[in-house]
């Protein structure tokens, strides 16, 4: 009996200890989302692959949302890990999954359909939803004018919500939601007349309109709205509170304004200047830097006139120019490229030309050996502009289309596809402003041809006297499109 009593006492003690252990375990709080981010040392963010959010160019990762969320990660003292979603439904589905992204930074607008899927931050960017049509076609001036039009918008977007609301008032209104396109695709489809109308936010139109000369704003649909970041639903406010504090601080210290100005405060115009202006620059600007072009072209074994043409395309031979994106100097070098090329002062024209020449030849040497001249030079120019990764993506697309991946004439047809979702989603490096390198190469070839012509011994005197006639370019009239190549 004594043995049974002792056994019961030991069991009771064991049960008590076990219960106490479980009770104490239950009392230990799980780490918050913010604590987990800091412990892991990684902020996992989901976004969209588009010009206004996130993409890769020759300098690496970029985009308004990327730069802002990178600053947030730096503030937290953690690394940034980016994941891209094919569409908005996928983005919200993935947000908050175990080991998945904890934050969505993708130009999101709070809406009724999303309230149960996420919690939204304080606002950081005001945008206006705009109805877009093609110039020369019938322009709607109010919501009633949307009836009978072929309309497409992003699936799951706030614009789709707006149209759904309007359809209650105008039952004849029809529209299509697509998850196979991005904003750039929608603008292109309007520009080419494939659809009548689309809806985009004002910031995305500002970034892309230069590439689509036929698109116009029909009217603003509704009032200005706010873009926000999003976190997963739940009661853990740790990350959301930190996000709000960061966004409020960025608003006060001018960080947000600087980013807005950099991405949306200007319009990049691609094209080449009129012959009169170019002739003036040949006379007034080139002589100051010609010796540097010739000297470093000789070192790198490249035609100095090609190097000068690159410099003119980049800066119009202006040594102290700085772009909104942070590239500087006559050859418009990034800080990263300048450091790699041994350039300590990007505003020093001699150093800039030296660095630009060295970098161009480095890019050219890294091209596949199967690419031969003269195509090799045009490929190198494209890679210099958009990055080698995106150029390889275009070559891959060319192969799939049974085109020659070693011929510029074929690959330049594929580069613009890198801005179209149906194509860039198949590539390794994703979205790129694929039309830019095509214009970049075309412009430089034109400048190079002119420089080759005017540097003939019998014409150099005309340049010095300012009496130069440049063939093939309309005097004083900038071209709207690059010449055929």
From Swiss-Prot:
Record-level GO BP terms: cell wall macromolecule catabolic process; cell wall organization; peptidoglycan catabolic process
Signal peptide: 1-29
CDD domains listed in its UniProt record: MLTF-like, PBP2_YfhD_N
Entry annotated with the keyword Lyase: yes
GO cellular component: cell outer membrane
Matches recorded under PANTHER family: MEMBRANE-BOUND LYTIC MUREIN TRANSGLYCOSYLASE F (PTHR35936:SF32)
Its job: Murein-degrading enzyme that degrades murein glycan strands and insoluble, high-molecular weight murein sacculi, with the concomitant formation of a 1,6-anhydromuramoyl product. Lytic transglycosylases (LTs) play an integral role in the metabolism of the peptidoglycan (PG) sacculus. Their lytic action creates space within the PG sacculus to allow for its expansion as well as for the insertion of various structures such as secretion systems and flagella.
Name of the protein in its database record: Membrane-bound lytic murein transglycosylase F
Source organism: Pseudomonas putida (strain W619)
This protein's encoding gene: mltF
